[in-house]
Amino acid sequence: LFDQKTIKYIPIHYVLNISPSQEPNYYQHRPVVPINNQQMPYRYYARPVAVRPHAQIPQWQVLPNIYPSTVVRHPYRRPSFIAIPPKKLQDKTVRPNINTIATVEPTLIPTTEPTVNNVVVPEASSEFIITSTPETTTIPVTSPVV
């Protein structure tokens, strides 16, 4: 590991290169990248030149525009100016409302009401035993039709 305090003060474009004879050489550091690399901008670069004999270059024949383009290109709008259009109602065919649900019959829900019966037992005359017997009543409930 290098001492980061000493490397911190060296300018970025100058890097200490150790030569095979272990002597420090101060050269401007250039990464090893091909000259024609498009990602690395250089002051001096070589343009690829195609050398050809003087010959006729075939060109595309211009055809008439018979088939119109199917894709309509809309101009780009910024999101702040885009308004959400309301949903378009499609042509709805009138459908008769047929009630597929059978006629609603009242549902009987049993409710329990505890009743207290005081029964006097001859063995224990001074004590009362409380027994509760549920009494069922039916209430007709109709569910609303959806």
Swiss-Prot record:
The feature of type site (Cleavage) is located at 80-81
What keywords appear on the UniProt entry?
Answer: Glycoprotein, Milk protein, Phosphoprotein, Secreted
Where it mainly occurs, coarsely classed, is secreted
Superkingdom:
Eukaryota
Q: Does the keyword RNA-binding apply?
A: no
Localization (cell) = Secreted
Q: In which tissues is it expressed?
A: Mammary gland specific. Secreted in milk.
Q: Which residues carry this modification: Phosphoserine?
A: 125, 143
> Which BP terms does GO give this entry?
lactation; protein stabilization
Decide whether keyword Transport is in the record.
no
Q: Which residues are glycosylated?
A: 107, 112, 125, 142
A single GO CC term for this protein reads:
extracellular space
**InterPro entries membership:** Casein_kappa
Q: Which Pfam families match?
A: Casein_kappa
Similarity-based family: Belongs to the kappa-casein family.
Functional note: Kappa-casein stabilizes micelle formation, preventing casein precipitation in milk.
Q: What is this protein called?
A: Kappa-casein
Q: Which gene encodes it?
A: CSN3
